[in-house]
Amino acid sequence: MPRKLQIPSVELQTVEFVQSARAQGVGHETRLSARGFHVAIEYAPYLPVPDVGEFNGVVAISDVYVPVRYRRRGWFSGYVALCALLADQALIIADAYGPLRESLLRQGFVEVFSSGAAQRLFVSIKTSENTSTKP
């Protein structure tokens, strides 16, 4: 029985996941892991965000675990930048607190409280010039 090919990093798995979900044209969610990193990610072809707007091609990330030896070295910021490139119109990050919350706000994310899901969402919206801005 042939072995399933293992993709060596969460970043490459993310690219493959988003490209595959976009090609299928339906929403998907999964958990990715490699070398101790874990990420829950979702792709939605269409998603209304309360008090912000309606978006196409949304990437949402949550429940991220970074191994201790890689923390405070910029891995998460780089991962957010990668996900922003993969998203068509919006990138959503769920439940960020402390220094991470402050960093996202400095990067232009807008904080939205989702009462239905009882969580904080941080939304970065792409403009036609492919930059992130506040709505």
Q: Which ranges hold each PLM region?
A:
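A short, internal acetyl-CoA/4′-phosphopantetheine-binding micro-motif in the GNAT/acyltransferase core
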Residues: 62-71
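Conserved acetyl-CoA-binding loop-helix of GNAT-fold acetyltransferases
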Residues: 72-85
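Conserved catalytic-core motifs of GNAT/GCN5-like acyltransferases
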Residues: 110-125
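Conserved active-site tyrosine of GNAT-family acetyltransferases
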Residues: 103-109
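Conserved GNAT acetyl-CoA-binding A-motif
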Residues: 85-98
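Conserved acyl-donor/pantetheine-binding loop and adjacent beta-alpha core of acyl/acetyltransferases
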Residues: 16-63
